[in-house]
Amino acid sequence: MTIAPDPVDLAARLIACKSVTPSDDGAMNIMADALKSAGFTVHLLTKGQAPDGPVTNLIAIRGEGYPHLAYAGHSDVVPAGQGWSSDPFTPTIKDGYLVGRGAVDMKSSVAAFIAAASRYTEHKGTLSLLITGDEEGPATFGTPAIIEWLNEQSIKPDYCLVGEPTSVERLGDTVKNGRRGSVNMWIEVEGIQGHVAYPDRACNPIPVLARIISDLESWVLDKGDQWFQPSNLEVTSIECDNKATNVIPALAKAQLNIRFNALHKGAELVDSLKKRVAAIDPKARVKAAISGEAFVTEEGVLTDTISAAIAKNTGITPSLSTSGGTSDARFLTKLCPVVEFGLVNATMHKVDEKASVEDIRQLSRIDEDIIKSFLG
């Protein structure tokens, strides 16, 4: 008989691992041991090289056949920074909260699901856990590597629950059924350096860049739709490496980000922006990096089942939302329908990050009901 780990105790053990991306510091082995004890076959994959690696990923599988429910999460954390009231990697329970880096994002969620899967071992179909050590970093060697391995093994989940902290005020108030896409762009306008007293012998790139920025700021990308707010362009940096007051600079740069909804594809937005820039300065250089496409999981079996489990345990009917930043769900949506649900996110990435002990236990009960609903 499997003795299920206590979710809070397991979360504390994981928090004690200084798994700042891309370091693991033993977190994967702790999870692997717990999952093996619960009857899972565990695969540990190491990918990549410094500076973004090596990264350790975990794939645990139990059972076989349809349906296949996957849980996805990450064990890496962001740097702790300064100003904590206690050591961020010495887990502490204070006033009913588990305090430590990763308590919210997202070691407690991973621990809650492992505990739930350890309690409910006799099920039909397939249950898997896909845990990466590279979500907070570039994600180059994380979830994409897991998906590559699954494809090589011809393993395809039917549904995926991502345990990111989605709750806002109370556990269960918000479920993410989609995410906006994100593209970063860099614009360079080249001029001709010269003395400010002789502008006829120079070409100032700053006014040209200013016109480009003004045009982009006035660009209405869309008005949003049923699931998404309007797409948004933000200028995040303007640079001109010139400290002299009597020199017209030779180069001006801008950096911007577009968070876009499912009405767009990243490449189409990049192409449209390049055309707008070229209309003002055909010689301007534009570079782009698309970090994720927008996606939405329509209401159906996955959203309904998770919402029902939340309502049963909390009395709350969650709101479906696509707000916030990107997550690894942007990769997993290529495999199957994806929904994200987890703890209250108020302190994630903050000093004295903390999760309610009762919320961790309740999350584990919700996870168990989700497993039962799909695989019972």
UniProtKB/Swiss-Prot annotation:
Top-level taxon of origin: Bacteria
Protein's GO biological process: diaminopimelate biosynthetic process; L-arginine biosynthetic process; lysine biosynthetic process via diaminopimelate
Pfam families: M20_dimer, Peptidase_M20
Pathway connected to this protein: Amino-acid biosynthesis; L-lysine biosynthesis via DAP pathway; LL-2,6-diaminopimelate from (S)-tetrahydrodipicolinate (succinylase route): step 3/3
Residues forming coiled coils: none
Residues annotated as the enzyme's active site: D76, E135 (proton acceptor)
Class in the EC hierarchy, top level: hydrolase
SUPFAM superfamilies (UniProt xref): Bacterial exopeptidase dimerisation domain, Zn-dependent exopeptidases
Record-listed Zn(2+) 2 binding positions: D105, E136, H349
Function recorded in the entry: Catalyzes the hydrolysis of N-succinyl-L,L-diaminopimelic acid (SDAP), forming succinate and LL-2,6-diaminopimelate (DAP), an intermediate involved in the bacterial biosynthesis of lysine and meso-diaminopimelic acid, an essential component of bacterial cell walls.
Protein's recorded name: Succinyl-diaminopimelate desuccinylase
